[in-house]
Amino acid sequence: RIREFGIECDKKNGGISAATSVAKLREYEENREYKIKTYNYNNLELLDKNSVDKEIGSSLYYGGVLDKGAGHLHPIKYALGLVKAAEKLNVKLYERSVVTKINQTSHAVEVLTDRGMVKAKKIAVCCNAYIKGLNLGIENRIMPCATYIVCTEPLSQNLQREILPNDYCVSDTNFDLNYYRLSDSKRMIFGGAVGYSLKIVEGLKKRTKRQLNKVYPNLSELKIDYIWGGLIA
């Protein structure tokens, strides 16, 4: 869709799954073999410790897998690009319409909102953690939790050469997994610190910054310009 509709959203190719232990690296190796044999997916490159250190710019990991078919983008730019593309195709968009109930009838699905109702033959329920009361079948099978992100000031040119030189995104195998990438403006966007409250507190900011410093000690002096959180499931 990015190519089809010409959406400018800072798209970058390549994502690394980084292993925090030898056992986790072995799991990655097995998973890679499974995907190759089962799905004929050949975009996965196994990285040893030296290779993952070079690609990430951190000595924390034991190895990993580079998925050349994955990548990252600017989510708001992508969403707004989809909106423009949909409008050109005469799709009707109803913003700020809170869905209160979904009814399944013999002929259609009714989506009730605080501003009106939409009927369709089929719907896509794309709520992730924000599904409370709409579909118990899904709601009873997920567990909402909060995740938090810090965004640093822009990196210096020297740091840009050391950290993520190929602009890949990264996630690791921590129980509270870390996930991070560089923005188009070369800020480090670093997420993690899973919790169960959306309240942003100073201690949380310090905790997330501490995780960032563990992965990248050379970023310890960087100022945190932004912090935010949200629910995932």
Predicted features and spans:
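Helical element adjacent to the flavin cofactor pocket in flavoenzyme catalytic cores
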Residues: 26, 30-34, 59-122, 126
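Flavin (FAD/FMN) cofactor-binding and adjacent substrate-gating region
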Residues: 3-81
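General small-molecule cofactor/ligand-binding pocket signal
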Residues: 10, 44-47, 92-94, 223-227
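Active-site substrate-recognition segment that forms the wall
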Residues: 1-12, 99-101, 106, 116-233
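Preference for short coil/turn "hinge" residues that link or interrupt alpha-helices
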Residues: 37-40, 66, 86, 92, ...
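A generic structural signal for alpha->beta connector loops
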Residues: 6, 40-43, 90, 108, ...
